[in-house]
């Protein structure tokens, strides 16, 4: 008997579990009628609280507080108002607390929804999409085949790209020089640029093929011999060496070399300008000239400060540590210019003394020449007589 009851109970439980598992997850079960009655009663009370505070559902927290302050000044027992009533104030206070908590919960729920929406949007933006075709990350995605084959193709690609860039730079340079003032010719040249380039390429190719057919390339001195691609150092990358050779042949110089030349020319110009300013003031310096010299020195120091900043930039890009430069000292440069000016003044004084001695010697020789000439005339007259 007991076994039969247990078996029936097991079957009933199994049936209920099976039915529960068959319910789709999106379908919500109906709630208990008692819970629905409780929620309806709470909503009615909440509407009554809103009515007591003279507010609409969906108002903000600030509106709730402002309405409570107005009603408190009106119904508080200690306010001294004609409408003061402690029972009404207790109801208003209870309504205020419930409405305020409801408004805060609604505000937090809205913020949570906004944050969830923003997070979903960000996840959608940064969601990884599987590429349709795989791309190589090395060698700029150029080439196909094995890694060694792709490396060779990439070297050829870089060499071709460098050659094209150099040719484009030379063409633009010549175009700026010869067609700088002719807008019409420049526009026409740009419109026919592609056609002219293709025509030149075809012409060069035809000339090469014609020369090969004639046998002009058969008796070359380097035929059948390996090309001299390297400068004798086997540790240099051949691709880098060839690119540098192409750039050097076309007059290109690295940025650090140009900056080094700029620094050298700038310091020479500053020294010459400072020396010329010192020569203009003369020697010795008057009080006015001393003020002028002080202003010149201040300007020189400011220019040296800018030049030292340029040296910092140069030291950051120079590839060789021994090529780096130290800062120039403005005071040492000023002392050096003053020493050069002192040597210049001494040289001028020596030159003036030599010129004075020479002029005095010529003046002393002139009377002797005149006396000798007169004696010779008198002798000639006596001979004639």
Curated annotation (Swiss-Prot):
Sorted alphabetically, the keyword list is: Chaperone, Coiled coil
Q: Where is the J domain?
A: 48-132
On whether Chaperone is a keyword of this UniProt record, the answer is yes
User: What stretch or stretches form a coiled coil here?
Assistant: 261-318
Listed CDD domains: DnaJ
The domain of life for this entry's organism is Eukaryota
* Function as written in the Swiss-Prot or TrEMBL entry: May have a role in protein folding or as a chaperone.
Q: What is this protein called?
A: DnaJ homolog subfamily C member 28
